[in-house]
Amino acid sequence: MLKETVDGLNIKPDGVYVDVTFGGGGHSKEILSRLGPEGKLFGFDQDEDAWENALPDERFTLIQENFRYIKRFLRFNGIKKVDGILADLGVSSHQFDVPERGFSTRFDAELDMRMSKKNDLTAFNIVNEYDETNLRRIFAEYGELGNALAIARAIIEAREKEKIVNTEDLKQVLARFLPNNKAHKILAQIYQSIRIEVNQEMDVLKEFLEQSLEVLDQGGRLSVISYHSLEDRLVKRFMKNGLFEGEPEKDFFGRFEVPFKLIGKMIIPSNQEIKINNRARSAKLRIAEKK
């Protein structure tokens, strides 16, 4: 959905744009191709590996920071308002495909899952040090698993005998919760739970969305791709109401005062795109314009 996501920004040739999930640089390249010589693009990525993809273009600045700090680092670069922000949430293909990062269920690797090596908390810490209450919380809240308590207890029971060091160890501990017909799906939910906790993904997303309102100029666009229901729920609510919970205030005439105008309906990838990139199957694109 690269074209649709960048189309959603309604790019002005001399505008200022932000790609907060630079990754391999695909979206940034497309944005730059539509900008004129006076346009500017800022990329954010906390992953040190992403710097290998930095683009040699004087209109482009790559900021090696988490996008939860978008306002601070745009200000640091002399930017108070922007015309569009793009976010492609979740784990990049590179992160999934490098075994030692520990993101994928396909490889045996140390339990890491950090999107930045600067972060102290790893998947190993969570699996081996979190108590039953917190393990249950992340599996129930972030994995939406009905048997979260049983999974938490199984992990604690296993680690009392020996540390759970790598992904293969974790799979063995979880084996009884992985029926053949659903093993991949359930394991993915458990991995997702741990990864979200390691990287504080829900808190980061909330902070980013709130700051997007502050840095977007009037008429500026927000284009966001999410990959699971937790992310999409937050994005949908925020774009609709400017809030994560509750209802917005009403004006004198009883109309809800909302900061965004929704642009079109939610977009999902075509069957053709899913055939080319199976990881896109759960993607949902939402676009909004600041009033």
UniProtKB/Swiss-Prot annotation:
Belongs to the methyltransferase superfamily. RsmH family. PANTHER family: 12S RRNA N4-METHYLCYTIDINE METHYLTRANSFERASE, S-ADENOSYL-METHYLTRANSFERASE MRAW. It comes from Flavobacterium psychrophilum (strain ATCC 49511 / DSM 21280 / CIP 103535 / JIP02/86). It is found in: Cytoplasm. S-adenosyl-L-methionine binds at G25, G26, H27, D45, F73, D88, Q95. Pfam families: Methyltransf_5 (PF01795). Disulfide bonds: none annotated. It catalyses: cytidine(1402) in 16S rRNA + S-adenosyl-L-methionine = N(4)-methylcytidine(1402) in 16S rRNA + S-adenosyl-L-homocysteine + H(+). Its main location: cytoplasm. GO terms for cellular component: cytoplasm. Keywords: Cytoplasm, Methyltransferase, rRNA processing, S-adenosyl-L-methionine, Transferase. The keyword S-adenosyl-L-methionine applies. Specifically methylates the N4 position of cytidine in position 1402 (C1402) of 16S rRNA. GO terms for molecular function: rRNA (cytosine-N4-)-methyltransferase activity. It comes from the Bacteria. This is Ribosomal RNA small subunit methyltransferase H. GO terms for biological process: rRNA base methylation. InterPro entries: RsmH, SAM-dep_MeTrfase_MraW_recog, SAM-dependent_MTases_sf. Its EC number is 2.1.1.199.
